[in-house]
Amino acid sequence: MSIKSFSTAVFFAATSALAAPTFADTITLDLWSRADRSGPLRAGNIVTAAEQLNRMFEAAGSDTRVEINLVETNNKGFDADALALLKAHSIGETPDIAVAAHEWIGSFVEAGLAANLEEHIEASPWFYADMIPELWTSVMYKGERYGIPQDSEIRMFFVNNDILRDAGYDQNFIDELPGRVDRGEFTMYDWCDLAADTVKKGAAKIGWVHRPNVGPDFQMAMASFGIEIYNAEEAKLQITKSGLTKYYGWLKYCVDNGSLPADMTTFSWDSTHAAFRGGDALGKFHGIWNVGAQMEAFGLTGSKDYFDKLTWIHSPAAENGGEPKNLSHPIVYIVGETEHKDLAALLVAMASMPVPNTAHAVGTNHTPITYGQVSMPEFQEKGWALVAGTPLLARAEFMPNHAKIGQYNAITYTGVQAVETGEMTPEEAVDMVLEELEIELGDDVIILD
C-alpha cells in the first residue's frame, strides 16, 4: 500500500462511522481546554495530531489543512470549566473538541453538546483495541460512550513499611499484605486495628490520615462497604442506608480505637501530607501522583528503595471475602456536536495513540490508557511507579457521570465530619445525610433502603 493510499485509508476508516466531511482548503477546529500546568499535553497532543494530519495531507497531494484554535480558559477547576463550557454551548459556541473531567459527560450529553462516539470507536480498533477496558466505564452515559479517556490515576492506601517493622511486623507480613487485601482476607477493620497497634507500640504517632476536605477519595471507602453510588440504567445517583450506616460506623470504630484522628477534617492539606511524608502516620489514602513528593521526603532514589519503604494496597473489603476497591478519575476528550465532528474524532484518536499519550502520562504522573504503553522505553525508564500502578485499575471505581455528584459528595462528607468529631452517632449522621440528599438532589437520587 502506498503512503498516499494508506493516509487516505486511515482518515476515511477512522471517520466512516460519522457523516462524511466536506472539506475546504483550511478547516479550523475549536479546542476547549483549561490552562492547566498539571496536563499541558492534553491540549498539546491535539495540536500535534493536527500537525501530523497536515503532513499526511501534504504527502497525499491534498491542499486541505487543519488549524486548531485553542480556546484556553483560566477556570480554577474542572467543575468551573465544565459550567463555562455548558454556557458557551448554550450561546452557540460549541467547541469541536473539549478537555473535561469525565463526570460531566452526562450533563454534556443532556445539553446536546457531546457527540456519541460508539460507532467511531467500534470502527477504529487500530486506535482503541488496546484501551484498558475499565477506563471505558468513565465515559459511559446510558450505556454508550461519549468520550475518550486521556489519562488515569490510582487512589489507594499508602503504607509505611518501616513503621510496620518498628512495630514488630516481619517482612513476610509486609510482602503478603497486598495479596491478602486483594483476596478479601484483610478488611477495613483489620486496617484500623493494624494502624492502632502501631500507635500503641510507639512506632507511629498517627495511625492513618485521609483527605481533610470534601472530595472523591471517600468514594473508594464507601464502595468497600457496598455503596454503589450510581444507577447507570436510570442515570441517577443512589445511596443505601444500610451501607452508609456501616461506612460511618467504621469511621467511628477507627476514631475510637485511636487509629484515625478525631479532628482529621480540621487538618490542612499541608499537615495531612506532613503526617505521612514526615513518618508520623502508618498510612494515608490518596493518589499515585504523590510518589514524587514521597521520594523526595523519604530520600528515596528509585523503585527498589521506594517499595522497600512503602506498600500500596486497595481500599480493603468491609468484610472477609468481600471485594477491595480503589478510585480513578480520568480526564477525557469529548467531541462536540459540530459540523466537523468526524474530523475532530480522528484528531482525538491520533492524540490518544501510545507515543503522544505516553509523553503526557510520564510527564504528569498519570497511569497509561493502553496496556501496550507500559512496555514503552519511556514508561520503563521514567514511569516505573505508573507501570506498577496500572494493574490496580482492575479494581477501580469512577465518579458517576452526573452533574450533581459534587453536591452528593459534599453532603455525604458532612456525615464524615459529624461522626469523626463525635457530634453525631453513625445512625444520626445517616438520617441527616439522607434527609439532605432528598432535599438537595430530589429526583436525582435514589434511596435504596
Task: Please give the residue ranges for each predicted region.
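Long, aromatic- and glycine/proline-rich binding clefts that accommodate carbohydrate-like moieties
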Residues: F307-A317, A361-A418, D443-D449
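Conserved N-terminal structural module of periplasmic/extracytoplasmic solute-binding proteins
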Residues: P21-S107, E122-P125, A167, Q171-N172, ...
